[in-house]
Amino acid sequence: MAQTWDTQAYEKNGAFVHGLAGGVVGWLAAQPGERILDIGCGDGQLTQRLTATGALVQGVDASPHMAAAARTRGIAVDEASAESLPYADGEFDAVFSNAALHWVRGQDAMMAEVHRVLRPGGRFVAEMGGHGNVAAIRVALIAVLARYGHGDLENEVNYYPTPEAYTTRLKKAGFRVEQMELIPRPTPLAEGGMAEWLRTFRRGVLDNLPGELREKVVAETTALLAQALRDEEGNWIADYVRLRFVARA
């Protein structure tokens, strides 16, 4: 199932995506003059931070709306899938990705492409959803969808691997894994809370429902999660778990 993006909703409800990326940016340690590919660059806010290091950063995103938003920030970005990158062999010193790889359906094809466009010894540094990511949200959403005969939709959205599984996959693609960590990261949500998170990050699921059912699913899922994911002040804290790694081609 393809996820669709509303860039305005993403900017409003997904600021934490780039705001909490300091850890993986630190692992990348971009250097002036390096050629870096940012896979799934989104609206380009994090890509801008990378360019500020003096690195030569190229963005790529499969969403035409996200690619267009990144271009308004002055980012060089191509619209293409991670499974078919429009770049020459060995073109980049590093490939970077934040909060994007779990959306990629063809993981093995993506890894083969990353390995191809990296120079020998180049690094692949990324953070993505890991095993257990938004588990409570997914269970609640699946339960509500199942009431209406659509319980399989959520299972088609994302890939949240264990460190062991992803290490094995990277090695099969020819990488040498240097670091791999699974990191729990409780994440405060924006003012719209869980309802806006669902409308933004599960838009692909909701778009596959009959129109009259979409808001009912949002409301019922939000109600199920209220006791588990709201704090004493009523703020929503999503149960994020990140998988962060460094691998060498």
Regions found by a protein language model. Give the residues of each.
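Core SAM-dependent methyltransferase catalytic element
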Residues: L243-A249
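Conserved class I S-adenosyl-L-methionine
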Residues: M1-E34, Q45-R49, M66-A69, R123-Y148
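C-terminal helical/coil "lid" or tail adjacent to the Rossmann-like core of SAM-dependent
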Residues: A173, E178-E233
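Class I SAM-dependent methyltransferase SAM/SAH-binding core
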Residues: R35-S84, A94
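Short alpha-helix
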Residues: Y159-A173
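A short glycine-rich, Lys/Arg-flanked "PGG" loop and its adjoining helix->strand segment in the class I
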Residues: D108-R123
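A short SAM/SAH-binding and catalytic strip from SAM-dependent methyltransferases
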Residues: A94-Q107
